[in-house]
Amino acid sequence: MRFVLASASPARLSVLRSAGIDPLVRVSGVDEDAVAAGLTDPTPPELVTALAAAKAEAVLPAVAAEAPDAVVVGCDSMLSAPDGEIVGKPGTPQAAAERWRKAAGRSGELLTGHAVVVLRGGEVVARTQGHLATTVRFSEPTEAELDAYIATGEPLHVAGGFTLEGFGGWFIEGVDGDPSSVLGISLPLTRKLLAEVGVSVVTLWGPPVAR
């Protein structure tokens, strides 16, 4: 059975490879704004889980033809900022700077949603989904440090405008909860969801792959 990651995230791919899974990567191309617009007053956990499910569902036709026996995992992340705002990817340097100034010296909650779909013989036989919240404690970068960080381009395209494993790690005081969820895919949550649909994660392991 193939493990299929419905995400273009290098961080998620790296986490899986270091944990013994070399997935088939298929990018969903889901319009996240359209998915969100189709929901009625979703809570943050409902939104992040719905987005993860949409990504997994979007790749099913292609995966069914290519790997008819597979487990497909979709993921989404967003930050519940210290001021209560729910934020995704900043997109612009100005938005990234504003978010960092609001978060500096405070804590936010990183929400990660996962959806798992099992295919056998090209047909869906099981689905499940869930979410996890992890507290992230932000440092207080100087203006010069913040300018330099934003200039790397890294915070523009990641949920909440920060990374734990890249340049952003210099400005994170700590994480309370599952660190892999902050990287985009929670290993404990994924294992739990796989078990719910009758798949043991150890059957998907291969030798660790260089990141």
UniProtKB/Swiss-Prot annotation:
Pfam families in the cross-refs: Maf (PF02545)
SUPFAM superfamilies cross-referenced by the UniProt entry: ITPase-like
InterPro entries, sorted:
ITPase-like_fam, Maf-like
Q: What is its EC number?
A: 3.6.1.9
- Major location, coarse class? cytoplasm
Q: What class of enzyme is it?
A: hydrolase
Q: Which CDD domains match?
A: Maf (cd00555)
Keywords of this entry:
Cytoplasm, Hydrolase, Nucleotide metabolism
Needed cofactors = a divalent metal cation
**Lineage top rank: taxon:** Bacteria
**Biological process, per Gene Ontology:** nucleotide metabolic process
Q: Which PANTHER family does the annotation name?
A: BIFUNCTIONAL DTTP/UTP PYROPHOSPHATASE/METHYLTRANSFERASE PROTEIN-RELATED, BIFUNCTIONAL DTTP_UTP PYROPHOSPHATASE_METHYLTRANSFERASE PROTEIN-RELATED
Q: What is this protein called?
A: Nucleoside triphosphate pyrophosphatase
Q: What is the originating organism of this protein? A: Saccharopolyspora erythraea (strain ATCC 11635 / DSM 40517 / JCM 4748 / NBRC 13426 / NCIMB 8594 / NRRL 2338)
Lineage, highest ranks first: Bacteria, Bacillati, Actinomycetota, Actinomycetes, Pseudonocardiales
